[in-house]
């Protein structure tokens, strides 16, 4: 086992604080409408330019191991805030730095760290309750646009795009961010249920100019097995031909004779058919087939429950207004499924999201909810260079997470005002069990002014003057650092999602509390590299001439 370096008490805390400040000082320059950029060197390719707090935090690794421990703990604050709400990483870092600095001063003055931590925890619980009380629902498209604009560093085009996307696909719909091809941002919306399986044969194409298959008012048969024998599907084909409607076959696979016969029938115009593979694999495929069945009021023909394809009737087939199939995707538009059943299915999948521990599973389940609930919107980000594209994509991603958080838990006045108001209210009523807890409460409430002060500092103004003016006001009254004006933050469109502010405060206080109560730090001693004896002798080859 490697030898360890151990530091105690104030020596340990001073080192840790130095690491905290290095990381937080690098992150906090990005806060607010006039926050600056940070340039990150990359091993390959061009450097990355960002205003995203967590991206800056992730890059920082310090040489001194004790300082690095402090930096890594604050990095954890930014990461946790990012995971929980997708935004608020810089606010969380600024809060953590403020609480740690204030807390360690109190510890150095001889206060009991455990009582300080209890006081901080009490203050945070009370302020979170107060934030919930002043929060208002985020319902209108205008409010969603404002939240997106603020989170994208006052970029109004991003706010507008996100608001449009949410309007099109609903608040549950999936919105993804991709690289665009031009200079301008664009929004693509896919309505209905789309899955990533294209036609099994190009001979099904009936719109050659677009290279797609389009079926109007088709029947849809869903089969949970491979179809290789045409006899199995013949009864359904005959029934559909009599009904005079097209047919979409969604099966695990269709091969050999069965596929050839379907192609021939389509080319001769006997029956209009298209076939695609079922989306997903294994259990996920079964679940997605069931989703399509509920959306189209059909039944999955599955041998597992004793159903036979040869005995399938028109009643077991789903229907939709329209189906569009490209070589890569199939889109089912306006399935005739029962609204109540679709809602029940969505609720069931949401419960699975709650229970799931895997991020990958959660993402896939969320996609299924979106496909059932409304559709998918794609925001294509445009920029002049790749570096600018990356930076903008990060901002759009942040804004997207912020608007989702706002829809979920509501909005509070932005610009650090919500924390100042909540802290002022709590300060008049909250007391601890002893004097040291009261100090903990006071230092936590004082630290909650830090985001407002940092926003003002980054805008080049005097933080103490603005903080005093904001505290003298009430309600939504605050300072707009973008326009350097005071006024009602909600009316000026300066909004923060309640969830983002709440998460930032809770994670910052949690990690800061652990740091304040640290008394000992242990790390590996650096290993001394021993010289290889053979390498050391390498320079002696020329000694032969000494004789």
Curated annotation (Swiss-Prot):
A GO molecular-function descriptor: unfolded protein binding
Any one of the GO BP annotations: protein refolding
KW Transcription (keyword) present: no
Reactions catalysed, as given in the entry: ATP + H2O + a folded polypeptide = ADP + phosphate + an unfolded polypeptide
Keywords, alphabetical: ATP-binding, Chaperone, Cytoplasm, Isomerase, Nucleotide-binding
Protein role: Together with its co-chaperonin GroES, plays an essential role in assisting protein folding. The GroEL-GroES system forms a nano-cage that allows encapsulation of the non-native substrate proteins and provides a physical environment optimized to promote and accelerate protein folding.
Family statement: Belongs to the chaperonin (HSP60) family.
Record's subunit section: Forms a cylinder of 14 subunits composed of two heptameric rings stacked back-to-back. Interacts with the co-chaperonin GroES.
NCBIfam families (UniProt xref): GroEL, PRK00013.1, PRK12849.1, PRK12850.1, PRK12851.1
Protein name: Chaperonin GroEL
């Amino acid at each position: 086992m490697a030898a360890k370096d151990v530091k105690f008490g104030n020596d340990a805390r001073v080192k840790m604080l130095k690491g905290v400040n290095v990381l937080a000082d690098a992150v906090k320059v990005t806060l607010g409408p006039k926050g600056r950029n940070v340039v990150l060197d990359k091993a390959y390719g061009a450097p990355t330019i960002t205003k995203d707090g967590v991206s800056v935090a992730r890059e920082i690794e310090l040489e001194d191991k004790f300082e690095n421990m402090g930096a890594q703990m604050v990095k954890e604050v930014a990461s946790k805030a990012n995971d929980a709400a997708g935004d608020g990483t810089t606010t969380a870092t600024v809060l953590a730095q403020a609480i740690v600095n204030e807390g360690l001063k109190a510890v150095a003055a001889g206060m009991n760290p455990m009582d300080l931590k209890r006081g901080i925890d009490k203050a945070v619980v009370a302020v979170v309750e107060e934030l919930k009380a002043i929060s208002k629902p985020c319902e209108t498209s205008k409010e969603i646009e404002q939240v997106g604009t603020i989170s994208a560093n006052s970029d109004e085009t991003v706010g507008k795009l996100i608001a449009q996307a949410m309007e099109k696909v609903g608040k549950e719909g999936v919105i993804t961010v991709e690289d665009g091809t031009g200079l301008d941002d664009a929004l693509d919306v896919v309505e209905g249920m789309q899955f990533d399986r294209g036609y099994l044969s190009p001979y099904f194409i009936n719109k050659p100019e677009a290279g797609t298959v389009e079926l109007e008012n088709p029947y849809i048969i869903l089969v949970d097995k491979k179809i290789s024998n045409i006899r199995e599907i013949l009864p359904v084909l005959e029934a559909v031909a009599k009904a005079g409607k097209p047919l979409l076959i969604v099966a695990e696979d269709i091969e050999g004779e069965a596929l050839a016969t379907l192609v021939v029938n389509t080319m001769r115009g006997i029956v209009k058919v298209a076939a695609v593979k079922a989306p997903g694999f294994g259990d996920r495929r079964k679940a997605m087939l069931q989703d399509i069945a509920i959306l189209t009021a059909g039944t999955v023909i599955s041998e597992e429950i004793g159903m036979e394809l040869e005995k399938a009737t028109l009643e077991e087939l789903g229907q939709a207004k329209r189906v569009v199939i490209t070589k890569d995707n199939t889109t089912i538009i306006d399935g005739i499924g029962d609204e109540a059943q679709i809602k029940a299915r969505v609720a069931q999948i949401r419960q699975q999201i709650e229970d799931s521990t895997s991020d990958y599973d959660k993402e896939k389940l969320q996609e299924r909810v979106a496909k059932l609930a409304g559709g998918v919107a794609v925001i294509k980000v445009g920029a002049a260079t790749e570096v600018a594209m990356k930076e903008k994509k990060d901002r759009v991603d942040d804004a997207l997470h912020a608007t989702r958080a706002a829809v979920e838990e509501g909005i509070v006045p932005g610009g650090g005002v919500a924390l100042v108001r909540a802290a002022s209210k709590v300060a008049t009523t909250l007391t601890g069990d002893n004097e040291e807890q009261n100090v903990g409460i006071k230092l936590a409430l004082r630290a909650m002014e830090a985001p407002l002060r940092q926003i003002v500092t980054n805008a080049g103004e005097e933080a103490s003057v603005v903080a005093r003016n904001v505290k003298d006001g009430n309600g939504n009254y605050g300072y707009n650092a973008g326009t350097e004006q005071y006024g009602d933050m909600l009316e000026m469109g300066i909004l923060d999602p309640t969830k983002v502010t709440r998460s930032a405060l809770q994670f910052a206080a949690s990690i800061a509390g652990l740091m304040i109560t640290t008394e000992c730090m242990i790390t590996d001693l650096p290993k001394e590299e021993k010289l290889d004896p053979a390498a050391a002798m390498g320079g002696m080859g020329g000694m032969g001439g000494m004789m």
